[in-house]
Amino acid sequence: MKIVYIANIRFPTERAHGAQIAKTCESFVQNGSKVSLWVPRRHTNISEDPVSFYGLSARFPVQRLFTIDSVAWGRWGFFLESVLFAVSVFLRARRTKADVFYCRDEMVVAILCLFGAPIVWESHTGAWGLVGSFAARRVRRMVVISHGLKTFYVEKGIAAPSILVAPDGVDLDAFKARSSKESARTRLGLPLDAKVALYVGGIGSEKGTDVVFTAAELLPREMTMVIIGEGGEKLETLRERFPHVLFVGARPYRELADNLAAADVLVLPSTAQNIVSARFTSPLKLFAYMASQVPIVASDVPSIREILDDETAFWFRADDPADLASVIRRIFDERERAAQKGLHASQKVHYYAWNVRAKKIIDFLSTDFS
């Protein structure tokens, strides 16, 4: 199967969606498909080759299409960039033979629908404005990352059989020879004798990290809350505002497995105040956490309950920092039970390997485009 994967992102990027797209393309290739990735021609501070940056074992061509890099101008700048990129995609697609145009962006989907291309839309956020509803009603198939998202689209009138639920995944090979806890902490500059609760990912209220910062103040002195995931000027501001939190900064995606080895507890603080977080999301960090075999404390929201259960995680009340701090303390008091949950999570995560996900998607597409 020849797949053209289209994504309106900087590439490579330090953000999680870049890793998700790179790993999906790699897994399509490993499952026998011929893949080309189309992205906009945008500036990135990352000079490293995507294969090295993401730790890929399979190559695929990356085509960079014309747009104006106006995202930094704000909402209208992003709209301008998106429209121009979609037009570039349309012009290129008309000259390109492919079995599937696999898209992440509703603007691109909507424009490609105008000439009847075989389009699949992978939706992550429940887009349903003027463009999103037009796109969803006209694509042949949709891939979504949670059952909550599928329910959302079915309630909007999209036929359930045309929607595949394929949660995000993890590269299990990266966890086969990961660092020891001591070497991981030494490399990251973390105290060797501390009890470490670690969060990896973006920072913001929509990520639930406000709860993490407040919970850190409620932990005993021997417990350290560590954050990996921000750099530059924002990092210094965060260190000043939250001196009780240890901010490591941004680290390359390829280090993820080794970095998680530094933790005694991994924190997943999804907020219930945001519908994407509460019902739709499928965080990459979740599956990496599971593969690490480190005990997980997770916010009790429906999107995370789709993957984790009482055998694989400890739960805290969403948006409740006192409860988060209490559960973290309990994990250290119940080490044997915590280790058992970590083991169960690492066994369950094999169902979410990238290559398993890719095969599931290809099988789904083959019934429509073969």
What residue ranges belong to the model's regions?
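Nucleotide-activated donor-binding/catalytic signature segment of Leloir-type glycosyltransferases, i.e.
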Residues: L235-L260, V265
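Conserved acidic donor-binding segment of nucleotide-sugar-dependent glycosyltransferases
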Residues: D310, F314-P321, R330-R335
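A short, well-ordered alpha-helix in the C-terminal region of glycosyltransferases
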Residues: T186, R330, R337-Y351
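Conserved donor-binding/catalytic core segment of Leloir-type glycosyltransferases
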Residues: V4-I6, P191-K207, F213-E217, V226
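Acidic donor-binding loop of glycosyltransferase active sites
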Residues: L260-R279, V294
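Short hydrophobic beta-strand element within catalytic cores of glycosyltransferases
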Residues: V265-L268, A288-A291, P295-A298, R305
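Carbohydrate-associated surface elements
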Residues: G148, G169
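N-terminal strand-loop element at the rim of the active site
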Residues: A7-R15, S27, N31-L84, R92, ...
